[in-house]
Regions:
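Secretory targeting signatures
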Residues: 1-39
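Right-handed parallel beta-helix/beta-solenoid
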Residues: 30-54, 71
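N-terminal extracellular ligand-recognition/capping segment immediately after the signal peptide
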Residues: 47-49, 53, 63-92
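Right-handed parallel beta-helix
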Residues: 68, 129-139, 156-168, 186-200, ...
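Right-handed parallel beta-helix/beta-spiral solenoid domain characteristic of secreted/periplasmic
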Residues: 75, 89-143
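Extracellular beta-strand/beta-solenoid scaffold signature
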Residues: 76-83, 114-122, 141-151, 168-182, ...
């Protein structure tokens, strides 16, 4: 019996050493990959989403994919940047401009056109940067139709000098709907335009059970333009852009124009923006929140308790109450200008 246990312990010891050897080798392999220098991947011709996907599949963490001022069209499959432990896709940049090593100035843009056949981007990796890209004609429908332009479950997404246009999300069943952009985590937008996106829900839900929006994320917006976006619902809340998950959110130097949120038998508010955080040096012009049961407020801006709004201008916005803005419980509003805002109920400029 003693010899049996000695043999058993010897086997266990060998097995444990082998396991540690395999795990150690795997970790070393990952460290070597992570330490490797970043590379450029060039796509040199017009093509399809499959060409962009092939570039992403080749890329490793830290690489830059240059689309080199080309146009790529979709035919039913979205572009995916997978996340997870072994994807090795974190910190990838997808740049629509021409590679500077090939004479690019950094001002060129590439177009990703889904042709209304699919969502454009589905991003699971973290610290992904999209820059100099026109993201257009994305379409997504069904329950929880989130992000016809860009959907991200990864953290720290960056969009720089991008346009998200003509993207449409819709649902006839339960769930939220977001047309241009939806992220579960932090997003940084700079010099971006969100234009002519449409989010609709025809599911006759219990009042305000779900939300229909142009976009939802936490983080910051700087030097952006948000215009001509449309949100419509039956029963669900209809809102423009929502940035409410953190008091550190910031929106600055951004123009919101001609955005429309409407709800039948539900609540419509913040047709341009609903925010928790700081809003500064922004312009809100001709935005409108509408509800057939007089549950509309904040034709332009709805800011949450503890938020600060300063140096902003509100012109020609419309809602039942608080045509320009409403704030809840507490907040600070200073050095702002209000011109020709119209409340069909009360609070032409401000409602609390």
């Amino acid at each position: 019996m003693k010899k049996f246990f000695e043999f058993y312990n010897w086997c266990v010891d060998k097995m444990v050493k082998k396991i540690f050897a395999v795990v150690g080798s795997a970790l070393l392999f990952l460290l070597i990959i992570g330490a490797s220098s970043a590379a450029d991947i060039d796509i040199n011709n017009d093509g399809t989403f499959s060409d962009v996907q092939n570039g992403i599949n080749q890329a490793q963490s830290g690489d830059t994919i240059y689309l080199n001022n080309h146009t790529f069209t979709g035919s039913g499959s979205e572009i995916s940047v997978a996340g997870g432990w072994f994807s090795n896709k974190d910190e990838i940049t997808i740049d629509g401009s021409i590679n500077p090593n090939k004479g690019g100035t950094g001002n060129e843009m590439s177009t990703l056109d889904a042709k209304s056949s699919s969502r454009v981007f589905n991003i699971g990796a973290s610290s992904i940067t999209l820059k100099n890209i026109i993201i257009t004609n994305g379409k997504y429908s069904g329950r929880d139709a989130n992000g016809a332009g860009v959907y991200s479950s990864g953290s720290n997404l960056v969009l720089e000098n991008c346009v998200i246009s003509n993207c449409e999300a819709s649902s006839s069943s339960r769930g939220d709907v977001h047309s241009a952009l939806y992220s579960e985590n932090t997003v940084t937008l700079s010099r971006c335009t969100l234009v002519n996106n449409k989010a609709t829900s025809t599911y006759n839900t219990v009042i305000n059970s779900y939300v229909v929006r142009t976009a939802s994320f936490d983080g910051s917006m700087t030097d952006c333009i948000v215009r001509d976006n449309y949100v419509s619902s039956i029963g669900a809340m209809a809102i423009g852009i929502t940035i409410v998950g953190s008091s550190s959110n910031k929106v600055s130097n951004t123009k919101f124009m001609n955005n429309y949120a409407t709800s039948t038998n539900g609540n419509a508010f913040g047709a341009a923006l609903q925010v928790l955080g700081t809003v500064s040096n922004c312009t809100f012009e001709y935005n409108q929140a509408n509800s057939d049961v007089n549950n509309s407020h904040a034709g332009a801006l709805c800011f949450r308790p503890g938020s600060t709004v300063y140096n902003c201008t509100f012109i020609g916005n419309i809602a039942y109450r608080g045509a320009a803005t409403t704030f809840h419980a507490s907040g600070e509003l200073k050095d702002c200008i209000f011109i020709n805002n119209t409340a069909t109920g009360f609070g032409g400029a401000i409602s609390t």
